[in-house]
Amino acid sequence: MEDFVIKEATFAKFMEDTVELFLAERRKEFRLTREADKELYCVYYGADKPKGTVIISHGFTETAEKYLEPIYYFVKHGYNVYQPEHCGHGRSYRLVEDLSLVYIDRYERYVTDLLAAAEAAKQAHPQIPLFLFGHSMGGGIAAAALSLRPELFAGAVLSSPMICPLTGDIPWSVAKPLAKLLCLLGKAKQYVPGGHAYDGKERFEDSASTSRERFAYYQKKRSTQPLFQMNAASCGWLNETARLNRYLMSKGWQRIETPLLIFQAQDDTFVSVAAQDRFAEKVKAAGKTSVKKLRVDNTKHEIFNSEDQVLQNYWKEILLFLQE
């Protein structure tokens, strides 16, 4: 497979001069409404001769704009792309006024919204297969969606999926009941301990990326758009990730019938790789589908924001999986 990954040295220029123009010609924005006054922002990019459709489920505090490079690769290789922005993110509806705070009342809302977007994509393109790509939080949401509608998807790529989050210096065994207690005390819509509003001070060295140019490209966009400045979790969000984890590990894995390609970062400080291992083994043991798991060297949590050679191998695996 040819070397098609955008080079780090000229990344920003190529994105601005080539990728953004290419995608703008193929871009359509629309909104889905499942509930009154709750609009889910979605964006669609059409391939010239589509052989499949990919729906992207983004991660915590992210937006569709963070995925322009992955979208470009999908579209250039013949896949339409649909990308909704999850509740509380970007241009989609929110349940709190603070633009920095990520809050969700029930994790099922994420899953139902994603499935609504997936159904819209399938209805628009019924003759070609639908695939799911989920990163981090979006990977956990994607896994739950797969368990509920296995017939909808031909395959799924889970990149550093959040089966269970990591909670820094506080062990998960402590953070989980603490989040539940804080919610019971009426603090569901408050920042988790240590969380704060967006201040624009995130450093590359502390980020989930190993590509400085890719990190800087999105941070520039984020710094000028308040709707892109989600920054920290609420107690309610953390409590719901615990509920999602419990569902995936107790029931969800039993219902997955879609072929899976799971990528794991070498140095992931945001989600538990051990939890990914347990989840993958459960799905594999159930015997209903294939599971391929790849640990990627020289990567942090955002594998899709890695250096050139890592990305070339990463995208080769993804495109081969979709073709199979």
Which residue stretches match the model-derived regions?
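Alpha/beta-hydrolase-fold enzymes
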Residues: 142-227
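Conserved alpha/beta-hydrolase
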Residues: 64, 71-97
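Alpha/beta-hydrolase active-site loop
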Residues: 102-122
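Catalytic active-site module of serine/aspartate enzymes centered on a nucleophile-bearing elbow/loop
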Residues: 290-324
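Short beta-strand/loop motif that positions the catalytic acidic residue
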Residues: 256, 262-264, 268
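Short alpha-helix in the alpha/beta-hydrolase fold that links the catalytic acid
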Residues: 258, 272-282
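Active-site glycine-rich loops that stabilize anionic/oxyanionic intermediates
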Residues: 51, 59-62
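An N-terminal hydrophobic leader/cap segment in hydrolases
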Residues: 1-33, 40-45
